[in-house]
Amino acid sequence: MFHAKKPSSMNGSYENRAMCVQGDSGLVLTTDPKPRLRWTVELHERFVDAVAQLGGPDKATPKTIMRVMGVKGLTLYHLKSHLQKFRLGKQPHKEYGDHSTKEGSRASAMDIQRNVASSSGMMSRNMNEMQMEVQRRLHEQLEVQRHLQLRIEAQGKYMQSILERACQTLAGENMAAATAAAAVGGGYKGNLGSSSLSAAVGPPPHPLSFPPFQDLNIYGNTTDQVLDHHNFHHQNIENHFTGNNAADTNIYLGKKRPNPNFGNDVRKGLLMWSDQDHDLSANQSIDDEHRIQIQMATHVSTDLDSLSEIYERKSGLSGDEGNNGGKLLERPSPRRSPLSPMMNPNGGLIQGRNSPFG
């Protein structure tokens, strides 16, 4: 019915018509209204060599590739499309390389961040430790200062108590010393008055130690000497009392106060003096009134020696008269009284502060 060879013959003719080979260039072109180039293996190898010579698909351009290949009938359209496909064929490798580099950089960045985080954590930890150490040391320093302040305050209180006790002790000692001095001073003044009076006056004479007036008139010159020594003895006693009063007031005056106990009237009442003796005693009393300090011990010893000599003379005379008529009563010579404690070894009288006599 239908013949089978016709379609086959038609298909064969179509294939022959579609593929047209250019003998000079060796290109295989289709017979379509828009002829298309068939990239053979040999042509592709020449394209790859040209791209490699030009520095890779990124640097190669269609014009440079066409000039390097030198194939007739090859147009820019053919090279442009094939170059684009070639670039797309090479892109997965590039993307893989870029991805690997990006992953590496990302990993390195993460490592860096991790290291930075760890280092920052270590730094923050170190800073916290340092801050805690500083706070601990400050707390210890504050504790030490507080203890030191407490010890200083305790030491100050202790020193204050010691000073108060010392002041109280000194005040008590001063009061006790003042009381004792007042007590001793009162007793000493009383004893001083009695001792000075007893030392100046001496023990009371025996009633038989002085000769009667009849004996004094008999002996003549001896009587005058006895009166002179007696008068001088009273004057020394008065001068001693006056010296005590002057020492009590610590003021040296030209004249002394008159003593009512030992006045001229009393002496005149005791003994009757002649005019010559009266003038002599008056002159001596006037001279003695202007004296301030007297050597008491020397005068007392001189008076006692002179009195002892007078008594010895009288005893000798009375012995001679006893052979003729009657024996007179013998009188022992008065003993020399020891030096008073108020007199110093040099013969001077230590003047007292107060005297019971005016």
UniProtKB/Swiss-Prot annotation:
It is found in: Nucleus. Residues 62-87 bind DNA. The keyword DNA repair does not apply. GO terms for biological process: flower development; phloem development; positive regulation of DNA-templated transcription; regulation of DNA-templated transcription; xylem development. The keyword Coiled coil applies. It comes from the Eukaryota. GO terms for molecular function: DNA binding; DNA-binding transcription factor activity. GO terms for cellular component: nucleus. A motif (LHEQLE) lies at residues 138-143. Residues 313-358 are annotated as: Disordered. PANTHER family: MYB FAMILY TRANSCRIPTION FACTOR APL (PTHR31499:SF43), MYB FAMILY TRANSCRIPTION FACTOR PHL11 (PTHR31499). Belongs to the MYB-CC family. This is Myb family transcription factor APL. The gene is APL.
